[in-house]
């Protein structure tokens, strides 16, 4: 996008996707020239709060900013969620959009999924409990169809709400509740 001023690139449109606004690519300004070879006249685009901020530069230079959902696109305009980039995003206005990402409903259809113990559909929901009981066995839990089983698949980082889960964990974990978590991420959660 630094080449937008060159006539042959004038009509090229660009988009930047934000998956997680917390990971902004922040470094000391000294690497702009020393490592990246970026000339000093372009520093104002790169610099934010005294450091090189690659996400800020990308947001400023692209035509459209995309996020993983419409609600996330709205959230990151708020100072609470933006990790300091709300003024830059707000300047983009309606050129910050969200396109919902999600699962492939054909590949993840419980009526045809070869990866589950018992196939089921909306008319045979009672078969679903076989999967619950088998998962409980696989996880070393006492199989009990009356026991609530909470499952969570996530990247194990604060941004995904693990700090909130940890905060309320003892309140939601009663005598008749089991919790299964699958993911990787920050060592404090993995351990």
Describe these PLM feature segments.
Residues 1-191:
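Catalytic cores of nucleotide-sugar-dependent glycosyltransferases that transfer UDP/GDP/TDP-activated
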């Amino acid at each position: 996008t630094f080449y937008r001023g060159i006539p042959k690139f004038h009509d090229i449109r660009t988009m930047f996707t934000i998956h997680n606004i917390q990971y902004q690519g922040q470094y000391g300004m000294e690497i702009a020239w020393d490592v990246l070879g970026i000339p000093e006249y372009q520093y104002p685009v790169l610099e934010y709060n005294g450091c090189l901020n690659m996400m800020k530069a990308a947001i400023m230079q692209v035509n459209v900013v995309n996020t993983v959902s419409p609600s996330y696109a709205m959230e990151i305009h708020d100072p609470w969620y933006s990790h300091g980039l709300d003024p830059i995003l707000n300047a983009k206005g309606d050129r910050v959009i969200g396109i919902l990402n999600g699962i492939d409903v054909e590949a993840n259809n419980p009526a045809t999924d070869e990866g589950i113990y018992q196939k089921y559909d909306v008319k045979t929901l009672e078969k679903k409990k076989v999967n619950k009981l088998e998962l409980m066995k696989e996880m070393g839990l006492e199989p009990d169809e009356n026991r609530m089983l909470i499952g969570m698949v996530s990247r194990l980082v604060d941004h995904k709400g693990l700090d909130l889960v940890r905060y309320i964990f003892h309140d939601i974990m009663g005598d008749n509740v089991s919790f299964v978590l699958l993911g990787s991420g920050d060592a404090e959660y993995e351990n």
